Amino acid sequence: MSRFTEKMYRNARTVTTGMVTGEPHEPVRHTWGEVHERARRIAGGLAAAGIGHGDAVGVLAGFPVEIAPTAQGVWMRGASLTMLHQPTPRTDLAVWAEDTMNVIGMIELKAVIISEPFLVATPVLEEKGILVLKVADLLAADPIDPVETGEDDLALMQLTSGSTGSPKAVQITHRNIHSNAEAMFVGAKYDVEKDVMVSWLPCFHDMGMVGFLTIPMYFGAELVKVTPMDFLRDTLLWAKLIDKYKGTMTAAPNFAYALLAKRLRRQAKPGDFDLSTLRFALSGAEPVEPADVEDFLDAGKPFGLRPEAILPAYGMAETTLAVSFSPCGEGLVVDEVDADLLAALRRAVPATKGNTKRLASLGPLLNDLEARVVDENGEVMPARGVGVIELRGEPVTPGYITMGGFVPAQDEYGWYDTGDLGYITEEGNIVVCGRVKDVIIMAGRNIYPTDIERAAGRVEGVRPGCAVAVRLDAGHSRETFAVAVESNAWQDPAEVRRIEHQVAHEVVSEVDVRPRNVVVLGPGSIPKTPSGKLRRANSVSLVTQ
């Protein structure tokens, strides 16, 4: 039995901890033992349907109460799990079905397990000849024991957030999960007896599926889990649950903390909830903006939020989940560097005066990983030299499944090219500057889109998190860029002119270069991934029409 499954099953039989779901209307607590018994039934149903060792299964379910036993049931059969992209009420089901069929064919899924709120997709999938298994039917089966699993068996195939038309899935093995889970346990100073995890993160994203479902199930940790829709309906539910359950650990992308800060200021008053129990509030999955972190800490202070609770981190699906954590209890550490030297010489030189740039330190590497930074010739850079971050170690995926077949993620020496530009400090802390493919090169300077987007976001009338910088003329001797922003006033010509002018002004103030053009769009126009990241490459048409 793999170390991952052996420990998960053992903890299910021995711990009294569990998972609370159904908040805020019908909270129910399920012990991990109860989840395990449901998983044995689901495994029985899967066996009856012919699912066995080495098979791949897709899952289309919205509620953690069903996703947890379904995932464990799939692993009991020695099969791998893929959380499929979920249709929304606005999704064209015919287009979604075509994209989903691409994924099903690519991964060679043997079946799709389905439940609410996606049962409406059942006939669409069955028409395409897909074996559809309903969670309710699987739960009615007789329970069976798990089959043997090996360290290099596939556990997860995590769809990346690229184009749905040309999908790609990251292969995650039992060995990968065990290694990264144990490393995070150490990095988070986890205490199974005391810690309570609170999360609304989606299970179709690695941070929600691995960090806040698989790992608590593996360690037998106390978990309170709601859905992203619950969070979007009531952002303050997040704070309410931390208060109600004395939550000690949570995680989210930068934008979610910025949103919570706004809601705390506008809709809550001191005494409404107590956030003082929170010791580990991880910020990851997108660039960590020091100003947003500081704003969140300021907004949370009247509610007992401690500044040392915030934990900037670095991670990706290709390393199972996590690469580095800031040290517990240290809070936000800002690396302030000379912005001109960073742009022109690719060197992160500490500075406190003049034109400086503030970057969040993302902490030292977790166990079982090593990192290096290389230049365009593959030469290893010294400390504070800016280049491409490469990673090696046990949590790193063997590779991807693509429409063209398997593509290895590691070179012959085991190094994985992250595509992230950054540097490592003298103390061994990782700092990320941006994505290689998004950086705009003008007159030999590296201009990072996040700087442009942050400047545009300062303009009154621009919706939070809804500004995108788009690289134009990539590869030409002089690249340029344009900016698209969303505003509720997009149909008011006078407001549009004001926003265009002010965005251009703020961008010039920030990066000393004027955008080729600024476009003001209505809400929902800028494409984003399911986890809320900007799709910069998909935004070109917004600024070139």
From Swiss-Prot:
Q: What is its EC number?
A: 6.2.1.-
GO CC annotations? plasma membrane
Under PANTHER family, the record lists: DISCO-INTERACTING PROTEIN 2, DISCO-INTERACTING PROTEIN 2 DIP2 -RELATED
Q: What is this protein called?
A: Putative ligase MSMEG_5435/MSMEI_5285
Q: Which GO terms describe its biological process?
A: fatty acid biosynthetic process
What is this enzyme's class at the first EC digit?
ligase
What does UniProt list as this organism's lineage?
Bacteria, Bacillati, Actinomycetota, Actinomycetes, Mycobacteriales
At the top level of its lineage, which domain of life is listed?
Answer: Bacteria
**Sequence position, cross-link Isoglutamyl lysine isopeptide (Lys-Gln) (interchain with Q-Cter in protein Pup):** K528
Question: How is this chain modified after translation?
Answer: Pupylated at Lys-528 by the prokaryotic ubiquitin-like protein Pup, which probably leads to its degradation by the proteasome.
What does the UniProt keyword field contain? Answer: Isopeptide bond, Ligase, Ubl conjugation
